[in-house]
Amino acid sequence: MIWVAVVITMLLFILVAKPTGIYLEKAFQGSKKLDKVFGPFEKLIFKITGVKEYNQTWKQYALSLVLLNGFMIVVVYFIFRLQGVLPLNPAHIEGMEPTLAFNTAISFMADTNLQHYSGENGLSYLSQLIGITFLMFAAPATTLALVMAFIRGLAGKELGNFFIDFTRALTRVFLPIAFMAALVFVAFGVPQTLDGAVTAQTIDGAKQSILRGPVASFVAIKELGNNGGGFFGANSTHPFENPGQMSNILQMMLMMLLPTALPFTYGRMVGNKKQGRILFVSLFMVFLLGFITITTSELNGNPALNGMGIEHVQGSTEGKEVRFGTVFSSLYATVTTAAETGAVNTMHDTLTPIGGLVPLVNMMLNTVYGGVGAGFVNIIMYAIIAVFISGLMVGRTPEFLGKKIEGKEMKLIAVTILFHPLLILGFSALALSTSLGTDAISHSGFHGLTQVVYEYTSSAANNGSGFEGLGDNTPFWNITTGLVMFLGRYFSLITMLAVAASLKEKTVVPETVGTFRTDNSLFGGIFIGTIVIVGALTFFPMLVLGPIAEFLTLK
């Protein structure tokens, strides 16, 4: 029965992807019906904020994005620092320590939601609502706006205006869908209140303080925006965030909704729907491979316990919630790292070595399907690399969407693809070379190495999940992961926007018999191969020293 539920969940991922992709294309390309509904409200916002409707260059678009995001980081930083003297603080929580406030503000603006604090004890209701929830809307709206400009550039059209795209992302996508999802979560038993904690009497007569808050609205945008940060420190393992299997499936659907829809949006906007389908199917195959790998490993259980003759028919249940089970915990772990959300319904630090390898690889590749917007930018980056390699092998100038891929584009892409592993491996080496980093490791040996690399991989990929055995709430970890999150977020977005702007200016080359098509199964295979080979070449040595070595040791 559990496998039937898994298949149904997978089918739901597939069934909602195309309709959502069509809606996104209409939402950002000026559908008359949507303009009638949302247009008056949006024009009022533009009038109040002084936004003028004009097309920006890629530099203007990128500058607008960085300045607005930077302003939000500063505002929210001071909210965290001053929350102790601000209203909506029934628990009288003190202001955040400076480096933790720095890390948290960047974390949520970068759509990472890495949490070096426990949500219910570290933030007031004001900080949760005005600081955290506000950024949970603003961060994915930023990247969804940018990916629309990116696709327009690939299609040879004007990039548009960042502030208009940002507003449309909020009014037409995130606010309405999150509102409806929050109502469903309330129906499933997720609390939504501004009242303080409830004191309850336990069976043995002791008193217990039960924390609550505006959880349903928080969880809705947490999953829809691929944010991932928990209202509670236990994240989606907490019964108030994720009461049962229905809420669990809805959370996974929300995580996958926009990342899986964007290939279809892309296909419609560039005038090649088949290419969008090829990208979707290719990535879904990689996703399935990851799910099968982690599930098989978790169901086989801990090799060390197997060697002792201990039977555990449910697989490795350490760190998992009984109400979700091993299979759905594995699916959730695959979804949350494939969609770069970072929410967890099981503790990733307790996964088997090969089970923990799958989330790690998903974040290292950062393309299957990746987070809202940012992931799709990486997908096209790998697609262009696949085209470039194919062109070199047959001695032709590579072409993508009828545009020649030349030195300028490949230099930008080369720098971008190297920057991600440089952040991960460089900062991991720094942490391992100083006691400021190694003192936080709770496990010696191979697992300890994986803890460190996982933290920086999660930060660079803007995922936010962690091997929570790491004691990361220290100035060293707060500052270094904050820098990795900021650089990992904005560097690739800006460089790939420059690539799209460069391609926009090029004339379309007429298609000939020798043109390498990017809308067939051959390209899909080369595309998958490029992702796997580039990822393996870059990160394989670390994976051998970490989870693979741990697995062989346990065997």
UniProtKB/Swiss-Prot annotation:
Keyword Lipid metabolism found: no
GO cellular component: plasma membrane
Keywords, sorted A to Z: Cell membrane, Ion transport, Membrane, Potassium, Potassium transport, Transmembrane, Transmembrane helix, Transport
UniProt xrefs under InterPro entries: KdpA (IPR004623)
UniProt subcellular location: Cell membrane
GO-annotated molecular function: P-type potassium transmembrane transporter activity; potassium ion binding
Disulphides: none
Topology relative to the membrane: Multi-pass membrane protein
Pfam families in the cross-refs: KdpA
TM helices/strands, residue ranges: 2-22, 60-80, 130-150, 173-193, 246-266, 278-298, 374-394, 412-432, 483-503, 525-545
Family: Belongs to the KdpA family.
Oligomeric form and interacting partners: The system is composed of three essential subunits: KdpA, KdpB and KdpC.
Function according to Swiss-Prot or TrEMBL: Part of the high-affinity ATP-driven potassium transport (or Kdp) system, which catalyzes the hydrolysis of ATP coupled with the electrogenic transport of potassium into the cytoplasm. This subunit binds the extracellular potassium ions and delivers the ions to the membrane domain of KdpB through an intramembrane tunnel.
NCBIfam families found in the cross-reference section: kdpA
Entry-linked PANTHER family: POTASSIUM-TRANSPORTING ATPASE A CHAIN (PTHR30607), POTASSIUM-TRANSPORTING ATPASE POTASSIUM-BINDING SUBUNIT (PTHR30607:SF2)
Protein name: Potassium-transporting ATPase potassium-binding subunit
